[in-house]
A protein has these predicted regions:
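Class I S-adenosyl-L-methionine-dependent methyltransferase catalytic core
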Residues: 1-161
Length: 161
């Protein structure tokens, strides 16, 4: 609901993993597409979709090169974490460039891991994180446990390109 606002257009997760975002999206009645590079994740995601008895499509592909459906309302992505290396940042930048080159109007929701703690996490994130080609509209800190939090970033295509 945060991502797409209406029932119009696809919700796409280009790093769908086990399919949690796909299931949540499909439960709202939206057209839903998931992409993952790992065939084991694609198979597991499909099994979870089947178990949840929802209508979502999942296929193998590269987040930096996949083709978006024509009618995309939002891209929602919760990239795999635990590595936080420069190559991970490059992967996200390349994924964003791919999306932006195909669709300049869809919303973007990115969920990222952050160090837990601090009362102004939302403000810190909006000043510390850049999403090339996108303007961050809001960010919400989500505590997970003592040392780990997550942040949900909602962004729209930047008009300054």
């Amino acid at each position: 609901n945060i991502a797409a606002g209406t029932d119009e257009g696809y919700v796409v997760d280009p790093m769908c993993g086990t399919g949690g975002i796909l299931i949540e999206s499909a439960l709202t009645g939206r057209a839903t597409l998931g992409i993952d590079f790992d065939p084991v994740m694609v198979e597991g995601s499909q099994q979870n979709i089947d178990w949840a008895q929802v209508d979502a499509e999942v296929k193998r592909g590269d987040a930096t090169r996949f083709e978006l459906p024509k009618d995309v309302a939002a891209v929602v992505v919760d990239p795999p974490y635990g590595r936080n290396s420069p190559s991970d940042e490059k992967l996200i930048e390349d994924m964003l460039a791919n999306i932006r080159s195909q669709n300049s109007e869809c919303k973007l929701v990115v969920i990222l891991p952050v160090e837990a703690g601090g009362d102004d996490l939302d403000e810190e994130i909006t000043t510390d994180i850049e999403l090339p080609g996108y303007e961050i509209k809001s960010a919400f800190g989500i505590p997970v446990h003592k040392s780990l939090g997550r942040v949900m970033i909602i962004a729209e295509a930047s008009t300054q390109d």
